[in-house]
Amino acid sequence: IDSPEMALSRLMDEGYTKVAVQSLHMIPGAEFHEINVNARLFAQMAGGIDQVIVSWPLLVSDETMEKALQGIMTRVVPKQRQADEAIVLMGHGTHHPSDAIYSALMYKAQKMDANLFVGTVEGSPSFEEIKEVLVRKKIRKAYLIPFMTVAGDHAMNDMAGNEPDSWKSQLASVGIESGPVMKGLAEFDAFVGMWIANLKTAMAHLK
């Protein structure tokens, strides 16, 4: 699979003059901004692409956060989940200021369902914080869901792996059963639809 830069280079070689790039990131973090900068460089090259627009990732507003959480609750959470069982979303997290979006998402999640939580691998809220709340609430089971485009390395190892520091193992150590959901958000039409809507908006701005 081409990197965004390789794909843009190939499109330039093939004579395309207007290109819309759709980010499949969750938030506008460091990687998103890197793609944004690199994409614009192609529009500045002599004989390059005339216009390049990079569209927004999944979460950029109150509306998109609420829509994403509704998608989680209606499309991703297993139907057998009981109200006293927790749902813990695993976000990637980042040192970029946009990491604050995960805390905002957590706030909205708690307003939607008192047992819906958002943790991150590399940012805030941390899993340690979430685990402490689960213990305090005497939660007996938690569904672990990757809040990521694909259920890749973080989901397989950091979330559902058998190593002592995985989220599943850490919950087991305090007597909480886990129910990992091994699917990324790109496997659900509700989220694909959000990205496609962003792409359509970007394409409408190509002149």
What are these regions (language model features)?
Residues 1-207:
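Active-site-proximal alpha-helix that buttresses catalytic centers in soluble enzyme cores
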